[in-house]
Amino acid sequence: YTDLDLFCLAKNIFHEAGIESDIGKYAVAQITINRLQSPRYPDNICSVVLDRYQFSWANQRSKHWTRPKGPNWDASYRIALNVLEDGDRVVGLDNAHYYHADYVNPHWASQMTPVTTIGRHIFYTRH
């Protein structure tokens, strides 16, 4: 992986699960990596993260390259590093490619199979 891969993965964790527990952060990281390993998605982490309409924060271009600060960023960065260097995974999410916050109901969710809920996110696989 590159420094840019690490930065993009950490940014995704931070914006999608920055206030979640470590397990919630790891889960978002795993979805990102699962997508990277799927032929349905781009072939590098930054392209997966910035793929149009995939992660809501990434639709705001002003957030793409700013470097966050604070304990949630530090935790997100540490988890991204653990995932990329050690392959840390969340049990039960190996086939999951989708999730959403529990306070929204996206149209695509009815076409998926829920796998688990971690923190405020519901994780899915395809039917």
Residue map of PLM features:
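Bacterial extracytoplasmic/cell-wall-associated proteins, especially those involved in peptidoglycan
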Residues: 1-127
